[in-house]
Amino acid sequence: MKHFRTERVRATPKLFTYVLVGFIALLGLTCLYYGSSFAPGSRKSDEFDGSNNRVRTGIGSLRNRDIVLAVSRFEVPKSVPICDSRHSELIPCLDRNLHYQLKLKLNLSLMEHYEHHCPPSERRFNCLVPPPVGYKIPLRWPVSRDEVWKANIPHTHLAQEKSDQNWMVVNGDKINFPGGGTHFHNGADKYIVSLAQMLKFPGDKLNNGGSIRNVLDVGCGVASFGAYLLSHDIIAMSLAPNDVHQNQIQFALERGIPSTLGVLGTKRLPYPSRSFELAHCSRCRIDWLQRDGILLLELDRLLRPGGYFVYSSPEAYAHDPENRKIGNAMHDLFKRMCWKVVAKRDQSVIWGKPISNSCYLKRDPGVLPPLCPSGDDPDATWNVSMKACISPYSVRMHKERWSGLVPWPRRLTAPPPRLEEIGVTPEQFREDTETWRLRVIEYWKLLKPMVQKNSIRNVMDMSSNLGGFAAALNDKDVWVMNVMPVQSSPRMKIIYDRGLIGATHDWCEAFDTYPRTFDLIHAWNTFTETQARGCSFEDLLIEMDRILRPEGFVIIRDTTDNISYIKKYLTLLKWDKWSTETTPKGDPLSTKDEIVLIARKKLWSLPAISVS
């Protein structure tokens, strides 16, 4: 908080003295009321109501003005309100009710209404999102791959709509996932083998000896394709919007499958260039020809040299006039993009991306799509519009005619070639990897008394740096969403070059995922970085609570002052089932002032409402 010093004023008339004292008192009360606007790490004019009152009203009336805010930076509200049960699946920046209230003019044909649009500070839901009635601790991996509690996601629309496609089946108090999909009714496992056979990979293994590791599955449904890729040592970023199928990604996350909400619309996906070896579309209902092929060009940006696009859709095989017309137009576009058909069988076609810039340079002048201008950064993604141009390879990639990455799993710990682009040496990379290996060992010693087998599956690293935290968890049956804060976004490419997945994000805003997504959230210096950007600690804590599962853990590594402040929130957030803190051992990444706090969230429910 800023401190204002007043000089002693001498005045003879008593009346003037009384007026001055009264003015200072009024000024003090004003600062007291608005103090959080100036306090480091505090929310600007965000207030909480008292007691356990639920927030029942519309988005514009969620603030209770009766609370007296703290003078000290380390004071906190007496309570944090609970959101109304209607908001048990709230995703703040994908809230279509907000679009109507703010009268946003979004182009529905371009899918802008499925993109990231956050509420202004005065319209934020600063309340704890409750679980649905009857919520249970999720079934543990690997059981969860095939079944989840119906009460946790009480939506059966997909089971009815896709009953003939083996997406999901309601079975008493559970929902089962047979492994089918719109295109692979007989199971994703058989479909994956068929793709490997089409590509003539040894042993019918789609990972091709570890050369294929990262996959982007667009329009993924309930992510059964990604679920069955895991046994092939392939990790997929399964992507789908919160559309008419609404809860498909929520089901995927409940199952413990790497997945996220997103759409190919007008903005670049939050992943750097050259992140994936393979992109997949199985009847994903995307118009790939729109806007001069801009959506295919986004896939082109994301694919590595020689990467594959698996397209299983009627346009690839149907012989009716309409589908043939679309298929021919796509073939023409791919040809101009220098892609070639690698394999075609039954209802699937696989296209291959060139391994260098040679074909681009041989095209006739004026051929569309053009190459992107030299000033375009293909790794810039946060709130950056897609571009209808081809991102050429770097000089190094063009010369070497490949990504330069070693096969998985060696690539997890081998220094990737693109380190030089962010000014990190191989020695620094190895040191970072070893540091995080030792840190995770210490974390697990602290967690061991509370962690049961397979009780942690979905993990988020809020500030992933070079991916060392996720790499150190590779021997555990978990997957990690590596989040790269916008101020460090150039490092995101290293995450993908290690065979990991993640997304760029601004922690001054809500993350685009469902409530109760993660079993463990790791925050290293995240609060210090948030404070430096002038954003709210309280907003960040409430957002962490929204995406943390009941009985999930947070590991917060930050300064002593920040940890002291956060500890005062543990009871308010219901993170007081268990907690511990320690002063960590010094290491190359440590600061002199550093504390590790681990806390566990309670399983709680809304109190019953008495009807008079």
From Swiss-Prot:
Lumenal topological domain residue ranges: 36-612
Keywords: Glycoprotein, Golgi apparatus, Membrane, Methyltransferase, Signal-anchor, Transferase, Transmembrane, Transmembrane helix
Predominant location category: Golgi
Compartments, as annotated in UniProt: Golgi apparatus membrane
Gene Ontology CC entries for this record: endosome; Golgi apparatus; Golgi cis cisterna; Golgi membrane; plant-type cell wall; plant-type vacuole; trans-Golgi network
Glycosylated residues, chain numbering: 107, 383, 562
GO molecular-function terms, A-Z: methyltransferase activity
Topological domains, Cytoplasmic: 1-14
EC number: 2.1.1.-
One GO-annotated biological process of the protein: methylation
Record-annotated membrane-spanning stretches: 15-35
Top-level taxon of the source organism: Eukaryota
Pfam family, one: Methyltransf_29
Membrane topology: Single-pass type II membrane protein
Family in the record: Belongs to the methyltransferase superfamily.
Record's protein name: Probable methyltransferase PMT9
Organism of origin: Arabidopsis thaliana
